[in-house]
Amino acid sequence: MFIDKAKIYVKAGDGGNGCVAFLREKYVPFGGPAGGDGGKGGDIILIADSSLQTLMDFKYKRHYKAERGQHGQGGNKKGKDGEDLILKVPIGTVVKDAETGEIIADLVKKGQSVVVAKGGKGGRGNAAFKSPTNQAPMVAEKGELGEERWIELELKLLADVGIIGFPNAGKSTLISILSKARPKIADYPFTTLTPVLGVLQLDVNDYIVLADIPGLIEGASEGLGLGHEFLRHIERTKFLIHLIDVSDFRERDPIDAFNIINKELEKYSPDLIKKPQIVVANKIDALSDKSLLDNLEKYFSERGYPFVAVSLITRENIDKLINLIRETRDKMKKEEVNESVILGNA
């Protein structure tokens, strides 16, 4: 099961207390103040780790507490600082304050880290309070309390390509063909209840990460069907594969289906509709009137959408689709490079 949300409690370590002590050495019966400071409490730090794919660990353990600083000692000995508690999260984790909703960090790079709760400072020992008017202070500070709060972790899929379409359009079958992913596949809506990641291997060191976004329906932007839970997974994809059912047994007109899904994307976020889309007409093996494909290709080509008709059952035109995915990826990479060059020269 793909867990992409978690709410956890974090409590940094308290600072150690300062010490009240006096120097007691042979031949120095009335030595001065020698109470050491308390150690600092440990921080709680989140760090992005490329080996993790889910937030599953945070489902079973929700409370985290860092070590407190040790108390100061006599002889001006400072207490030992508490150890930081480091929590590893997947790359792409967004960290929010659960109470205010404020975004604390967006961990998008390997090794990127953020302190979510700071340890308390250690209290000063009585040696720090010595003054010309008070040569033997009997006071020391208590350590500060470590920060504590509830935070929310949200993982957005770091996929290059999002596969979208109505339930049963064939998205799970497509990702299983293009990659080694093995999602649950059956002939009823909402078979895929969680996003599935797959990798399309183009060459030894060349691959494209795909995300099978669970079936969307009309009203998804208002939370109907699987709604917001999965619309937000599309946000970080670079482009989309929009699958439509063209079989004789289809439930709706392919163009209507395409436009309904796009309206839901636009309602959720106007930026989503701007993402490039490859339109894939699936189930041509179950289509008797092939002239429909010519009409569809004309319709989508006129609107600037690359179009390919496939059969995921017979694997017809799968190679064409893979080439189209590669071409779209390469074109976007080139545009990104050109844009960065222009910005660099500005």
Curated annotation (Swiss-Prot):
Residues 159-330 form the OBG-type G domain. It is an enzyme of class 3 (hydrolase). One of its GO terms (cellular component) is cytoplasm. GTP binds at residues 165-172, 190-194, 212-215, 282-285, 311-313. It is found in: Cytoplasm. The keyword Transport does not apply. Its cofactor is Mg(2+). Its main location: cytoplasm. Keywords: Cytoplasm, GTP-binding, Hydrolase, Magnesium, Metal-binding, Nucleotide-binding. It holds the Pfam family GTP1_OBG. It comes from the Bacteria. GO terms for molecular function: GTP binding; GTPase activity; magnesium ion binding. PROSITE patterns: G_OBG, GTP1_OBG, OBG. GO terms for biological process: ribosome biogenesis. Residues 1-158 form the Obg domain. SUPFAM superfamilies: Obg GTP-binding protein N-terminal domain (SSF82051), P-loop containing nucleoside triphosphate hydrolases (SSF52540). Its EC number is 3.6.5.-. The keyword Metal-binding applies. Mg(2+) binds at S172, T192. CDD domains: Obg (cd01898). Belongs to the TRAFAC class OBG-HflX-like GTPase superfamily. OBG GTPase family. An essential GTPase which binds GTP, GDP and possibly (p)ppGpp with moderate affinity, with high nucleotide exchange rates and a fairly low GTP hydrolysis rate. Plays a role in control of the cell cycle, stress response, ribosome biogenesis and in those bacteria that undergo differentiation, in morphogenesis control. Monomer. This is GTPase Obg.
